[in-house]
């Protein structure tokens, strides 16, 4: 059921996701899609939610942006994703970063990992793609008593007249079925998901940051999104990309562009 308090129709977004394959975007995804920034990991450590030596599972890990950040904090991390091309890119990025992460092909709803094996389970920028009740149940199964779940987002913010709003309008012209426009980066329904899975001590946190993008990088970031190369064929993606390049030159010529983003998370603890 759609949550009327939520800015995006997450049911429609998940239905749209049935035709999305991020594996098709793996190169752009790894090169241009900004991962969670340092402010996100600082938030986790400042709140005492992570610590060296903990065991973590990162669901829907993609190219490893959250997993790598956790590994850099001294956690033992396993990343789970259904798209093997993204895991291949993640391993390349790990080598460059000098961290070691275990990756397994699987889904958030059925990871195949042992029960009560994780101190921390994370899901970054992906919860809306899952069968949420099943994924939340899997989170509870994976956590040790006292373990913590963190569902996080790093969303661009479409504001009147800004490049994000113009880009979203262009995506919709090329892909009218895309359900990801108009977001605020806040997802209150995720708290209900965690509560229904038995987690308590629920909290949210957020911080707004600006992410710099050149024209080339923004085009790559948008190609890597669900509404473009992950769901359009190569020819339609190329046409879209050319129009976006022209739009940026015409309406947003200054580089780098400052793209407003919101870090937002929901977290809860499995009772001991």
Model-derived features: positions:
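Conserved class I S-adenosyl-L-methionine
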Residues: 2-51
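Conserved Class I S-adenosyl-L-methionine
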Residues: 3, 188-272
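Nucleotide donor/acceptor-binding cores
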Residues: 53-54, 116
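Class I SAM-dependent methyltransferase SAM/SAH-binding core
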Residues: 55-57, 63-110
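A short acidic, Gly/Pro-enriched loop at the edge of an enzyme's catalytic core
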Residues: 111-120
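Short catalytic micro-motifs in class I SAM-dependent methyltransferases
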Residues: 125
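A short, conserved alpha-helix within the catalytic core of class I
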Residues: 130-138
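Conserved catalytic/acceptor-binding region of the Class I
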Residues: 140, 144-211
């Amino acid at each position: 059921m759609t949550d009327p308090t939520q800015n995006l129709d997450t049911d429609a977004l998940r239905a749209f996701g049935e035709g999305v394959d991020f594996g098709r975007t793996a190169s752009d995804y790894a090169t241009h899609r900004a991962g969670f920034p340092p402010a996100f990991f600082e938030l986790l450590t400042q709140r005492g939610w992570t610590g060296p030596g903990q065991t973590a599972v990162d669901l829907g890990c993609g190219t490893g942006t959250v997993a790598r950040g956790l590994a850099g904090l001294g956690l033992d991390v396993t990343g789970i994703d259904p798209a093997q091309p993204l895991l291949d890119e993640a391993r390349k990025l790990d080598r460059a970063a000098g961290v070691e992460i275990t990756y397994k092909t699987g889904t958030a709803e059925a990871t195949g990992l042992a029960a009560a094996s994780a101190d921390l389970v994370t899901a970054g920028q992906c919860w809306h793609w899952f069968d949420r009740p099943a994924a939340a149940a899997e989170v509870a199964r994976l956590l040790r008593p006292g373990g913590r779940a963190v569902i996080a987002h790093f969303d661009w913010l479409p504001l009147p007249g800004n490049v994000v709003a113009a880009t979203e309008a262009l995506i919709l012209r090329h892909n009218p079925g895309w359900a990801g426009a108009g977001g605020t980066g806040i997802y209150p329904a995720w708290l209900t998901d965690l509560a229904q899975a038995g987690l308590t001590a629920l909290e949210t946190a957020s911080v707004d940051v600006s992410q710099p993008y050149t024209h080339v990088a923004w085009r790559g970031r948008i190609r890597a999104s669900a509404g473009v190369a992950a769901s359009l064929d190569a020819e339609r993606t190329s046409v879209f990309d050319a129009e976006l390049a022209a739009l940026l030159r015409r309406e947003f010529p200054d580089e780098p562009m400052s793209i407003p983003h919101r870090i937002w998370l929901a977290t809860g603890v499995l009772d001991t």
